Design a protein with these regions (language model features):
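Non-catalytic cap/lid and distal C-terminal segments of serine-dependent acyl enzymes
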Residues: 1-246
Length: 246
């Protein structure tokens, strides 16, 4: 497994952007032994990994999912690449900035993906791409997934900010309600989470557009990392994968 910290000079952002990529190890098998060279060779060496773009919450950064949760372990166990990008506190959508370009949507959807697909053994196919996040990152996953449904097979939203952000001019609800052919949405929230109403509003909107979704409502949890760690693993296990590493 590789843990790669990358600082990329971004044209869409007008500055360098930090992100972390977890790339699982190639599977080895005792049957993959070449007696002539006395070496084991990698199974599926020409196959591409599926990808989860995993977004952090407010006040965190691209390291949060590896500091407070087991993102590396889940990536390795499930043979799935995970990319975590710094969204600062900007909610992952394009917005005006005085001295820089805060084009977070364009960066993720175009520049970041183009770099990942062109540099690493990662599949660009829709059926192999997923996006997920917690809180602010849950908003980002919803915003990206429903804005660009042809790019993602599934969305994971853990304790997402949603309707509570509308009064601040941050609106994903309109995008969800107008989405056609929405990806599968895995939604999770704890009973003690202060954003519980946001999750309930999202459920109503998913029903309104007749989207395929699963809502994991769990008693006893608040807005906390123990919950998000559990839900990330559940989300990965729920994916209906078709890639060679499933």
């Amino acid at each position: 497994m590789a843990h790669i910290d990358i600082n990329l000079i971004s044209n869409t952002m007008g500055r360098s952007v930090d992100f972390t990529l977890i790339l699982p190890s190639r599977p080895y098998n005792i049957e993959n032994y070449d007696a002539k060279t006395d070496k084991y060779y990698q199974d599926k060496k020409d196959k591409l990994y599926p990808l989860i773009i995993l977004l952090h919450g407010y006040l965190n950064d691209e390291k949060a999912w590896t500091r407070y949760a087991r993102a590396e372990l889940f990536a390795e166990e499930n043979k799935i690449a995970i990319c975590m990008v710094s969204g600062e506190n900007k909610f992952y959508f394009n917005q005006e900035a005085k001295t820089t370009k805060d084009n977070f949507y364009d960066f993720i959807e175009y520049e970041l993906k183009d770099y990942l697909y062109g540099t690493f053994p990662i599949s660009p196919k829709r059926e192999d791409n997923y996006i997920a996040g917690l809180s602010m990152g849950g908003f980002g996953a919803i915003y990206h997934g429903f804005s660009n449904p042809k790019a993602y097979k599934a969305i994971g939203a853990f304790s997402p900010a949603y309707t509570s952000m509308i009064e601040d001019g941050i609106d994903a609800q309109t995008i969800v309600r107008n989405c056609k052919d929405a990806p599968f949405c895995y939604l999770a929230c704890g009973s003690n989470d202060f954003l519980l109403n946001d999750s309930n509003d999202l459920v109503n909107d998913l029903k309104y557009i007749k989207a395929d979704y699963y809502y994991d409502f769990v008693e006893g949890y608040g807005h906390e990392w123990r919950f998000w760690d559990l839900e990330l693993e559940k989300f990965i296990k729920s994916l209906k994968r078709t890639d060679p590493y499933k």
